[in-house]
Amino acid sequence: MIHILDIHSHKPGEGAIYNLTIEELRVPPPYFNQKQWLSVGLHPWSLTEEWRKDFLHVRKWALLSQVKAIGESGLDKIIKSPYQHEAFFAHVKLSEEVGKPLVIHCVKAVDEIIKIHKLFGPKQPWIFHGFRGKPQQAEQLLKEGFYLSFGEHFNLDSVQICPADKLCLETDESCFSIKEIENRIRKVRKSESESFSKDLLFQ
């Protein structure tokens, strides 16, 4: 079992879970640096009528030991795509099948994501990536068992109320290092020693 600090990054690096691009997914595994931890999934923005073919690649990658999470996948109300729900459900089922956490992309769809979580009752952790919501929304998600992942931009109050064992960190597309983001979070929480997401261990 390993503990990972940077749970979602679009830049490869030691100690980070690098999220493969759609182009990288289409190359048969394992071609990537096998020491690099990965996450695999179809971003809502990447979905086309051919998404099921791409998802076959996701399934192949998901079986590799270096793949530590499924996603990012979810719902995004800013874009109009008829494939989002079906694709998201497929990722939920894959997460459960391979026993790996699901990284959630959510834009203006929190209530719907919660309903889906209740519908499936997953055993695997769902990590709400890039969380910037207000504390009321954070409390709503925490109550349902979600993990919250904070990056460069975050709500100060939400960071303060999030239990350490439900708090994750990520660089996403930030120019800041994970250490810089960690230091900012610790400053807000006035804590130098607590262990974040200590009960979220990756296979």
Stretches found by the model and what they are:
Residues 1-203:
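Mid-domain alpha/beta scaffold segments of enzyme catalytic cores
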